[in-house]
């Protein structure tokens, strides 16, 4: 894989990932979701107004996703970063146990951050925020930064989700596994939760391809349990968590590139010896 190929693939993986997160989240706003009411209440917004705001928020999310795919601007990506971060922060603010849901949402707010880093957001002028966002030029420094953020993202979302089973003991998880015939109970989801927490630490400390591929498969399967348990309408829960699948793919691309680069450099050195 050449640097140019990595650049293009990584760029599109992250764009599609961020867009899917917003499409899935936005769809629930358009449909309206009772589970959102505590978020509005935490900001002093009464339920009757919250129900009316949900479709507006949902439609805006979907519009941002379409713009990111069709006509991206850095200001749109910055909005997506801020909004995804805020909706993640709302979860502990609204009374969900601990901060596990915030960390589990790392796959929503860190992909936009990676897109901004790719596009040189730190060194931009004000007018650049509104200009077209073309495919960024990669270099070794950016590759290293993205490698770290991908590892961090995967670790956080695994540890956050693991906390649901290990500490919060969410009944939802029991229902998920029961939907595919696994006789799950509190002890079972405790064990799965600790497994995910340990897996998150391992990914951060030892990001090797077999482990990352396992994480990708694990997240696709376990997040699809929303659909097996709740029906096809919950496909939007699966789509909303696209960061759980897209970020491992991004890390796999980076590791493959770095491995091939190391092998290419090693050949001339061996010949010189």
Could you say what each language-model-derived stretch is?
Residues 37-51, 176-186:
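Perimembrane loop-to-helix junctions flanking transmembrane segments
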Residues 170-176:
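Short acidic alpha-helical/loop segments enriched in Asp/Glu that coordinate divalent cations
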């Amino acid at each position: 894989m050449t640097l140019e190929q990595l650049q293009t693939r990584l760029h599109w993986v992250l764009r599609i990932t961020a867009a899917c997160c917003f499409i899935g989240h936005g769809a629930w706003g358009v449909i309206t979701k009772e589970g959102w009411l505590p978020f509005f209440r935490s900001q002093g917004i009464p339920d009757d107004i919250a129900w009316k705001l949900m479709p507006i928020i949902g439609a805006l999310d979907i519009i941002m996703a379409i713009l990111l795919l069709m006509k991206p601007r850095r200001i749109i990506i910055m909005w997506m970063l801020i909004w995804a971060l805020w909706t993640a922060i709302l979860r502990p603010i609204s009374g969900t146990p601990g901060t596990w849901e915030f960390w589990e949402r790392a796959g929503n707010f860190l992909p936009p951050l990676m897109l901004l880093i790719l596009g040189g957001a730190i060194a931009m002028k004000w007018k650049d925020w509104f200009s077209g966002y073309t495919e960024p030029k990669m270099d070794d420094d950016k590759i290293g930064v993205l490698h770290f953020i991908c590892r961090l993202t995967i670790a956080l979302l695994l540890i956050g989700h693991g906390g649901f089973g290990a500490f919060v003991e969410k009944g939802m998880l029991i229902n998920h596994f029961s939907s595919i015939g696994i006789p799950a109970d509190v002890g079972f989801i405790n064990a799965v939760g600790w497994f995910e927490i340990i897996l998150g630490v391992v990914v951060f400390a030892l990001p090797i391809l077999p482990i990352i591929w396992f994480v990708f498969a694990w997240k696709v399967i376990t997040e699809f349990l929303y659909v097996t348990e709740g029906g096809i309408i919950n496909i939007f829960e699966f789509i909303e968590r696209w960061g759980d699948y897209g970020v491992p793919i991004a890390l796999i691309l980076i590791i493959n590139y770095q491995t091939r680069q190391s092998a290419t450099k090693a050949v001339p050195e061996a010949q010189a010896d």
